Amino acid sequence: MLLLVGVGCEMAQCARRGGGLHSPMGRKGVRLGGVKTYPIEIGGVRRDLPVVQVGPGVAVALLNLLGDTELVEAVAAELAKRLPSEVETLVTPEVKAVPLAHALSRITKKPYVVARKTEKPYMINPVSRTVISITTGKPQLLVLDGADVALIKGKKVAVVDDVVSTGSTLKGLRELIEDVGGQMVAVMAVFTEGSPREDVIALGHLPLFEPE
């Protein structure tokens, strides 16, 4: 079985995103040790995502790839099958999707670039954009080091992220990529979240939850 999420996209939408299954659990999730969780399975790897409140009246199933090598490798293997052949470079926002971009780069042999959250003293002619994060609700800086421009300029680029929700990060990344002469031709993610997005190659869909 490729992918199981607690509630998935409709079957036609899943097919467009690369396939998937869903269970009748809906937005309720389950409780483990008193913590509300949302079950997922990708490439035979199962996880229970904690449901956490991120704003007034809004909670999300929190996917954390950091330190989870087994899940990262399973996700990368599935996304690699769906990477458009025209893609030449991968770009990912710091920080949670960095392990995924690294694993996907290793499998596909495509170089990857990390858009940092802050400007660093060693950066050469950095290019930046400010977006609003759905997780924190606060402005977030996206910065490309000028030293990475050669990997993007004149290239067809795929953005790699863990979860795509409002699209504010994507908008900022698209502007950064275009500013340095690249072309964003694909967006790849583990999950979309909230409203379904047909413009994202994802392995499944996560709903938003109402805090208890």
What is each model feature region?
Residues E88, K155, V185:
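Conserved acidic residues
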Residues P99-T108, R174:
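Short Gly/Thr/Asp-enriched flexible loops that form oxyanion-binding sites at enzyme active sites
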Residues G20, G26-V87:
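Active-site-facing substrate-recognition patch
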